Amino acid sequence: MIRISIDVMGGDYGPEATIAGAARVTEYLPNIYFLFYGLEETVKPVLKKYPCLASISCFCPTESYTRMDEKPSQALRNGRGKSSMWHAIEAVKNGEADVCISAGNTGALMAMSYFCLKMMAEAERPGIAGIWPTLRSESIVLDIGATIGASANQLVDFAVMGAGMFRALYHTEKPSVGLLNVGVEEVKGLYAIKKAGMILREVQLEGLEYKGFVEGNDIGKGTVDVVVTEGFSGNIALKTAEGTARQIGEILNSAMRSSFFSSLGYFLSRGAFRTLKHKMDPDRVNGGVLLGLNGIVIKSHGSANADGFASAIRIGYTMVHNGLLKKITADLRRFHQNKQTLFYKEDKATENEKII
């Protein structure tokens, strides 16, 4: 049984989307159980609309919820032990749930998750990993906005965690990994990026294949399975891609309605356009995963509808089913052991050269 705690109050649509999304996944996800957290007067009327959830869920009323405009520090101070978001995260900490999902305030979710679950011993900093539609299939990009800036060691941790997530979702034994940079040449880029590349080249790990630097246009091409960057660049890349997709959609829609022959062309090509729409639909890959914590937390888009929230649930379910946390913990531990051994040998070799 996979247990999923949900902050029902999060997002633009609240319970109307979160509970409806939970009801939809019952059609294709077996052995699932939900813990719903929210305000009783708001949630119970919506729950009554979905009798399919009655036997596979429980409702846990809370005193408050986290508003979308609250600062992380304010949300943590006001919501600790009270809000629906806090209780949903705490359920993972207490072993009552396997994964927490919220469409609420991103900063508040990061702060509460960090404070409640704490970091993995092997990881320095959490990162948000997003699933990115590409020409090949899907890639994972992280960090897409958890924090600003990253050291070489933190970028390396992101690479290891992202590869573990890719294996958990897509059953690829050795995902390819690239570092986002301003060019593919090894001499280009910030020191932290070049240092991270050097570490990934030198320290071998069975769970990933390092392919070197990649550029922004490689993300959409699907050049690698996992693209690693720091949160500032990652968030800009994400928002740029989302805006470009909407722009293309609006341009196509306008062009198809511009004349009779354009409309006829659209009618004849509607199957291809449906495929394009499905491929680029953000709801299909909705859900940013907070990696590096002692528990799985997923941030759904605040604007996600029921289908989008169902996708976030499906992602969380799949990662729990395939043992994401165990994979990441083992990979990080093995990687850092290999790194210590390698650089210890290099230091010894340097000392011997000095003696000679």
UniProtKB/Swiss-Prot annotation:
Catalyzes the reversible formation of acyl-phosphate (acyl-PO(4)) from acyl-[acyl-carrier-protein] (acyl-ACP). This enzyme utilizes acyl-ACP as fatty acyl donor, but not acyl-CoA. Its EC number is 2.3.1.274. This is Phosphate acyltransferase. Belongs to the PlsX family. Keywords: Cytoplasm, Lipid biosynthesis, Lipid metabolism, Phospholipid biosynthesis, Phospholipid metabolism, Transferase. HAMAP family: PlsX (MF_00019). It catalyses: a fatty acyl-[ACP] + phosphate = an acyl phosphate + holo-[ACP]. GO terms for molecular function: phosphate:acyl-[acyl carrier protein] acyltransferase activity. The gene is plsX.
